[in-house]
Amino acid sequence: IGYTGKVTTERLEELKQVNDDYELNDVVGRTGIESSMELELKGQKGSQTAYVDNVGRILTITDEVQPVAGNDIWLTLDLNLQKAIYNILERQLAGVLLKTIVNKEADEIVYTDSSNIKLPIKDAYFQLINNNVLSLEQFASDEASDVERQINAKYLNARARIENDIRSELLSGNATLMRDLSEEMQAYMIYIYTYLSSDEAGVIIKDSIDTKSAEYQAWKNNAISLRDYLYYGIASNWIDTTKLNITSKYSNADDVFSALVDYVFQNLADDTEFTKKIYRYLINNNVVSGKELCLALYSQNVLAYDEAEVNRLRASGDDYAFEFLMNKIRNIEITPAQLALDPCTASCVVTNVRTGEVMALVTYPSYDNNRISDPEYFAQLNADQSLPLRNNATQTLKAPGSTFKPITAIAGLEEGAIRIDETINCTGEYEEANPPIKCWKYPGFHGPLNVIGGIENSCNYFFSELAHRLSLDADGNYNPDK
């Protein structure tokens, strides 16, 4: 449906080209139906001419024009169908997560194929923090619960150690090559480099880096330390020293690097993403447990307080924490959108095949349209990794799939690639393509099908052969441009 808000300067210019009544303080549709149907929904403004006294009080009204409401818009959507489909999509996604999340470490999971991907439970625990289901600020607040204080204390101890290790590594005259660092330390070093290269920081001038240099190639291959690579950057003038706090008019490479290290730690102090990266490894290394995070869900009122469950969590180990979180996903008390694990989005469009009317246009996840003008809520939506502001039903690019088969059939008949009474023999696997295209009935097959049978059975083999014929030139040779 969208929402309304004060017109922007750019939108005002567009609207005034159609209707000169629009003014800078007008409230207009900002998104959705409210925006696309703005000209229909807009009414006529009222006016009042009056005499007032010296303090602005109305004495006499001499003329008054009543405002006129705009046109009504009637949607073809079925509200109950919308709600039902949204709930179905959410439960389907939850079902996929229940099959995907396993109580194993990442290195214990054996990848077989894309249809059987498994996720370690620690990914789900981390997403409680990474997708802001749990508030890091609440962990450190005066009102924090015992378990929140416990989590925060572990984080503070780890952060002090990590910052000391990073500083020691950066300032060491014999710095470790990237490939010889631990996975965790390597992740922190890469994060620092990525941060310095970001548009926000702009300390590393990416366009000035010589990508053919030996140092750059060594960096790409983890064969150089971050310290040595940044020293190379200082010498090569792709470190923007104006962003650093260098007081001396003349400074050598050591002065610049020292200022660069100070800059890194000053800015990482309030960097939420770096904080989350530390939590990622605290969870991976079993320093912060799943049990603690599940208890924090009650402390922060993400879950309605349940004394029996809280006591059971406290008395149990991480195996029960896994079972607990799976139950919350199963009951949609923790939603796929909150975890923002793949998959966490879905959509569904239902049309009336007789009239073309759209009966349901559902995107998951969604948001509360009544709160969209709340800046805090809007910021929360923008930070949500499940992208609730994206309308998956209208903005996601999808292959048309079998719905395009009738168009292919019509093209085949019009171009003479097939006659209405001609058949194509479906053997189950179309081998003219590489790799072969399997019919949905494979290892079964449809046998001979004419155009009507091809459409009726939605036969992949039939339409693969028909599409192939449409791509042949006059001599029967394949032409990829046809």
Give the location of each predicted region.
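Short helix-capping/linker segments at secondary-structure and domain boundaries
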Residues: 6-10, 416-418, 470-474
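Periplasmic/cell-envelope proteins involved in peptidoglycan metabolism and beta-lactam response
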Residues: 1-377, 420, 479-482
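Short, glycine/proline-biased beta-turn/loop segments that scaffold the active-site neighborhood
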Residues: 110, 362-364, 372-374, 398-452, ...
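Surface-exposed acidic, glycine/proline-enriched linker/cap segments
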Residues: 377-395
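Residues on a specific face of well-ordered alpha-helices
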Residues: 31, 35, 39, 43, ...
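Exposed loop/turn and edge beta-strand positions of beta-sandwich/beta-sheet ligand-binding modules
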Residues: 344, 388, 445
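Short glycine/serine- and small hydrophobic-enriched flexible loop segments
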Residues: 90, 410-417, 465-469
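Second-shell loop/turn segments in exported
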Residues: 20-26, 67-78, 334-339, 391-398, ...
